[in-house]
């Protein structure tokens, strides 16, 4: 790798603002806000609106809309069911 062209990779705390869930991970994104983590160290705090704690795919609360495709619409239009 070339020197001095890659962003600094460091540990940060992500805060899901919709559920107040926090997790420690690595990132190149920085922040002026900091938070003290469970290990006693202070890390930059990055606020996110959606994480694996609140996203419907991971929580199992997703909606399964049954929207027909073109064939289904054609059959319905011409009463070919």
From Swiss-Prot:
User: Is Iron there in the keyword field?
Assistant: no
**InterPro entries recorded:** Ribosomal_bL28/bL31-like_sf, Ribosomal_bL31, Ribosomal_bL31_B, Ribosomal_bL31_sf
Supply one GO CC term from the record: ribosome
Q: Which domain of life is it from?
A: Bacteria
In its UniProt record, which GO terms are filed under biological process?
A: translation
State whether keyword Ribosomal protein applies.
yes
Residues spanning the membrane:
none
Keywords of the record:
Ribonucleoprotein, Ribosomal protein
**Which is an annotated GO molecular function term of this record?**
structural constituent of ribosome
Quote the subunit structure annotation. Part of the 50S ribosomal subunit.
The family assignment reads: Belongs to the bacterial ribosomal protein bL31 family. Type B subfamily.
Which protein is depicted? Large ribosomal subunit protein bL31B
Which source organism does the UniProt entry give?
Oceanobacillus iheyensis (strain DSM 14371 / CIP 107618 / JCM 11309 / KCTC 3954 / HTE831)
Name of the coding gene: rpmE2
